[in-house]
Design a protein with these regions (language model features):
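Conserved active-site and cofactor/substrate-binding residues in soluble primary-metabolism enzymes
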Residues: 34, 38, 77, 81, ...
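Long, charged amphipathic helices and adjacent flexible linkers at domain junctions
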Residues: 106-115, 201-212, 245-269, 426
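Short, Lys/Arg-enriched N-terminal segments with co-localized hydrophobic residues
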Residues: 1-19
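Short glycine/serine/threonine-rich phosphate/pyrophosphate-binding segments
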Residues: 39, 132, 222-225, 377-380
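C-terminal cap/substrate-recognition subdomain and adjoining C-terminal extension
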Residues: 268-427
Length: 427
């Protein structure tokens, strides 16, 4: 390279630049320096004046520092004049500029790569660290994929960690086909455990940007408790019911059988206890924000729960939820009989209901999202376009394609590709 210095600015000119042809040249320019209004306009006006064709362009601003790349074609055999003008304008703007000629063969090869598979990798954590970025980047490279773009989804991070509940999310856009997807998933899971983060790997398709229906489990997902355990404590059978619940969540007991066993233990409990529990449900971190934004952007929302309709309807009123399907407890003379009414909403039924609601709402199954924490949520998680295990048991987390374990339920927004910069300002 020939290096030309102008006070604080410089330009790198490849040696072959002096031997370039003067017709239909393809040139890549990279500009970096302090960002301020008018830099991009001033440089692109030079290209416009010379009737250049823009073949690719990208710009990023990190901490008020500009990084701009433009790939253009000179069609009038005057690339020397264009580069000269750009050079002096960059000096005037106090930015650094670098030129690289691109051969037709190099350009054609680049164009041919556009058919490669594209994926989105999303990182969630309480704090973003260099180890996290390095770890994800290493795994991507080992799978022979290339990172095209990296952007921060969460807002600017304050130095005062006590200012708010911290969360950080970064999105990678990558291109290529993984050599071994199962191995990659295992590596991501291992890394997420070691570095306290969540890693989502999704195909970058139009459906990812057009989700329209989201279905939630209720207990230990929308709320930070298992309602049946709360009822059992009031009935004096807390330990017995909790043991059955935990075994069912781990997939060790058939859900329907565990449900019948637990309901039977609640026989004789006064229904007034249900209202008391409903009014004091511990809402999961991030639910208020998530529900507000989902309704704002037009999502249909459903609760598909192995819990009870009484509590699902309470949340339905609180958050304007569209559908609630759960289990109905039988009541006689103001007390629970220990039986239930109707079919049990188990894992199979949840998947059926997701399909049914999608059909009613005219939503493609690939436009759906399912979120849950237990083994009986896996059927709906597995068929949804985006299935998420939330603070789930190890077996569920290992089976689900995506999981969230480090931050609140509003982490789903980042898996959907939303950015804080335009969410919170408009909500």
């Amino acid at each position: 390279y020939n290096i030309l210095f102008f006070d604080n600015s410089y330009v790198l000119l490849p040696n072959r630049m002096t031997n370039m042809a003067q017709n239909d040249e393809i040139i890549l320019i990279n500009i970096n320096g302090a960002d301020r209004p008018g830099v991009t306009a001033a440089l692109t006006e030079i290209l416009a004046k010379n009737n250049a064709v823009i073949l690719d362009i990208g710009q990023a601003d990190i901490h008020n520092h500009l990084s701009l790349g433009i790939l253009f074609q000179s069609t009038e055999g005057n690339s020397g004049d264009i580069l000269k003008e750009l050079l002096f304008k960059s000096y005037e703007l106090d930015v650094n500029i670098r030129f690289n000629p691109i051969t037709e063969q190099e350009y054609s090869k680049w164009v041919g790569m556009q058919g490669k598979n594209r994926y989105i990798i999303t990182i969630l954590s309480r704090k973003l660290t260099a180890k996290q970025i390095a770890g994800v980047s290493r795994i991507v490279a080992e799978q022979d994929m290339n990172i095209d773009d990296i952007k921060r989804l969460t807002g600017r991070i304050p130095l005062d960690e006590n200012a708010r509940t911290p969360k950080a999310s970064v999105e990678f856009s990558v291109r290529g086909t993984p050599k071994n997807k199962e191995c990659m998933k295992a590596e991501f899971m291992k890394l997420s455990t070691e570095l306290e983060m969540d890693i989502s790997f999704q195909e970058d398709s139009m459906y990812r940007r057009m989700r329209r229906l989201i279905c939630f489990d209720m207990d230990s997902t929308l709320i930070e408790t298992e309602v049946i355990d709360e009822l059992a404590i009031r009935a004096g059978v807390g330990d017995q019911v909790k043991a059955i619940t935990e075994a069912a969540m781990r997939g060790e007991i058939d859900f329907c059988e565990s449900f019948r066993q637990r309901c039977a233990l609640l026989k004789g409990l006064d229904v007034s206890v249900m209202q008391e529990i409903a009014e004091n449900l511990p809402i999961t971190e991030g639910v208020d924000r998530l529900m507000r934004i989902l309704k704002k952007v037009g999502f249909k929302i459903a609760i598909l729960s192995g819990g009870f309709t009484y509590f699902g309807n309470f949340l339905k009123q609180k958050y304007n939820i569209d559908y609630v399907y759960a289990n109905e407890l039988e009541i006689e003379n103001g007390k629970l009989t220990g039986n239930h009414v109707g079919d049990i909403v188990d894992g199979k039924r949840k998947a059926e209901l997701l399909r049914l609601i999608a059909q009613v709402e005219n939503v493609d199954i690939r436009q759906t999202v399912a979120v849950g924490d237990g083994a009986n949520d896996l059927p709906m998680i597995s068929i949804a376009g985006l299935g998420i295990a939330f603070h789930a048991k190890p077996k569920v987390k290992a089976t689900a394609k995506q999981s969230i374990s480090t931050i609140g339920l509003d982490g789903i927004l980042y898996f959907l590709g939303y950015k804080d910069s335009y969410l919170d300002e408009q909500m």
